[in-house]
Regions:
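Beta-propeller domains
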Residues: 6-33
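Structural motif
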Residues: 11-16, 66-73, 110-116, 174-179, ...
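N-terminal targeting or regulatory segments adjacent to alpha/beta-hydrolase or S9 domains
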Residues: 162, 167, 326, 337-423
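Beta-propeller fold detector
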Residues: 24-32, 85-88, 123-132, 226-229, ...
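Serine-hydrolase catalytic core recognition
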Residues: 247, 378-519
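Conserved beta-propeller blade repeats
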Residues: 1-7, 35-56, 74, 90-108, ...
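Predominantly five- to eight-bladed beta-propeller fold
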Residues: 22-23, 61-66, 70-73, 127-155, ...
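Short loop/turn segments that connect beta-strands within beta-propeller blades
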Residues: 19-21, 78-82, 118-121, 219-223, ...
Length: 519
């Protein structure tokens, strides 16, 4: 809880830093000085630390599949003896997961689940055998679940490290879609340089059949596989499976097809029986973020819900008893950081100052709410595991991202990144000033917007206007944050058009996020 780790800029090391000072404490991993078989690796793409901190999974050779999914070649690094070996030699892996005791790793390869036992010379065994492309997927979501429920993993260990539980997706009845593949870049596909190829996969369009989903468990000692008896509509969803600290309970989330009725079950992996502990019903629809932002710590379930029209937090016990409403008001909780299991304090971010700003808060177990960030703009946080420190990431409409170290008590201890060089470079260009504004429609609805005027703007003159609009649900384009390049890929088209004499305007209309369900 007193330190954090980062990959070095050259991707060769993993370095540990002090949360208190921001200074380097130790080099935990150095690719050029590890022991073991000679391995040629370009660099570290990511890493996963075991619960006991003794083992680190080193992620390399990452290849994207869809928006969030990827395969990679993982290596097991033993921190104590500085030795690294491959997790598996049979092909790239997906979504590896450590067992709570740190002695095993489960992963997915080609739609099947595998298990590696570190105490048995990294012996690898196959857990499922029915996985097949475009038919059966074990432990990782299909395309539509990954895209719409914002997840790339559907597999957990039980708290005693004796069972693996996962969601199985049967997409055999889902209709196929084919899209052309071209040479492209990052990486280039030379086989499509002259003629395009085809990628055919299961793609459920609106109103069509989705995958049939079920939940399973595997007993590591007896090798017995069991189907969990989770109640589900014929066309229902299982958007998430989550571990708890009780080995006899795995949390399974279900949604009806209309997505206005969420149920959370506690399922026993041995008996296969499911007990309903929480239901949440809303007038409109339950956002996918409500499922993924639910936190389960100790005996607590922290549930985001729009049941009163705004996204707020509700604290339950594992048995489904509502302990307290954590937040309330005509604003939205935007990020959920977690619960301090020792105190019951809840850490989150919300736009309590208005839809364009975001601040970080802690809701104490005694009912008192304390604001942890104070600069206007967009604030987010990365907390230490003991909730004594946090990294504050801040920007506003005219200032790029700044990273600072802070204590939960309110003291800033270090500036990690100030981006002064970027701000100086940007100031050299003749750019228009970006400003926020608001107006009220003929229906009495206040809308927020931003505007970029040409440099040397003369209020007495008339200017042509370009309107940029997205308007997607849950999305906000109008924020008090640093953001240049509305079209992505580094194209600062809004400033270019301002240089050509246009006024560029964006307005968040009805249906966009941050302002409650009715809006």
């Amino acid at each position: 809880g007193e330190t954090y780790m980062q990959i070095s800029p050259d991707k060769r090391k993993i370095v540990k830093y002090s949360f208190k000072t921001g200074k380097e404490v130790a080099t935990v991993f150095d690719l050029d000085n590890v022991r073991g078989p000679k391995i040629r690796i370009d660099g570290v793409d990511g890493y996963i630390v075991s619960p006991d901190g003794r083992t680190i999974l080193i992620q390399t050779g990452t290849q994207s599949i869809y928006r969030r999914s990827f395969t990679a070649e993982y290596y097991i690094f033993d921190v104590r003896n500085n030795k690294m070996v491959a997790l598996s030699l049979a092909g790239p892996q997906q979504t590896p997961v450590f067992s709570p005791d740190g002695t095993m790793i489960a992963f997915v390869r080609e739609n099947n689940i595998y298990l590696v036992k570190l105490l048995y010379d990294n012996a690898e065994s196959q857990v499922t055998k029915d996985g097949k492309f475009n038919e059966i997927i074990n432990g990782v979501p299909d395309w539509v679940y990954e895209e719409e429920f914002m997840t790339n993993s559907s597999m957990v260990f039980t708290a005693d490290s004796k069972q693996i539980c996962w969601i199985k997706y049967d997409e055999s009845k889902v209709k196929q879609y084919s899209m052309q593949l071209f040479r492209g870049s990052h990486p280039e596909k030379d086989e499509y340089a002259t003629y395009p190829g085809l990628y055919t996969y299961k793609y459920p369009k609106a109103g069509e059949d989705n995958s049939k989903v079920t939940v399973w468990s595997y007993d590591i000692k007896s090798h017995q596989t069991r189907k969990m008896e989770v109640p589900l509509d014929a066309d229902g969803y299982i958007p998430r499976i989550a571990a708890t600290e009780d080995a006899s309970k795995v949390a399974v989330f279900t949604l009806n097809r209309h997505q206005d009725h969420l149920s959370i079950y506690m399922v026993n992996p041995l008996s296969t029986l499911a007990k309903l502990v929480i239901t949440d019903k809303v007038d409109k629809y339950i956002k996918e973020t409500a499922v993924q932002d639910t936190r389960i710590v100790g005996n607590y379930i922290l549930l985001p819900s729009e049941r009163d029209g705004f996204n707020h937090l509700y604290l339950y016990t594992l048995t489904g008893q509502l302990k307290r409403r954590v937040t309330t008001g005509q604003y939205e909780v935007l990020d959920v950081y977690g619960i301090d299991g020792a105190t019951g304090d809840v850490y989150y971010a919300a736009n309590a100052d208005g839809a364009t700003d975001k601040q970080v808060f802690v809701a104490r177990a005694n009912g008192k709410t304390v604001r942890l960030t104070h600069k206007a703009g967009q604030n987010s946080a990365i907390f230490s595991s003991n909730y004594k420190y946090f990294i504050n990431v801040w920007s506003d409409i005219n200032n790029p991202l700044t990273y600072t170290l802070n204590t939960v008590g309110g003291k800033q201890t270090a500036v990690l990144i100030d981006n002064k060089e970027l701000k100086g470079k940007w100031a050299k260009y003749e750019t228009g000033t970006k400003e926020l504004f608001a107006f009220t429609t003929s229906e009495g609805v206040k809308l927020n917007g931003w505007m970029i005027k040409p440099a040397g703007f003369d209020a007495k003159k008339r200017y042509p206007v370009i309107m940029y609009q997205y308007g997607g649900p849950g999305n906000q384009q109008v924020l008090n944050s640093w953001n240049i390049g509305i079209k992505g890929q580094g194209a600062v088209i809004e400033q270019y058009m301002a240089q050509q004499g246009y006024v560029v305007v964006c307005v968040d209309g009805r249906g966009t996020g941050g302002r409650g369900a009715n809006f």
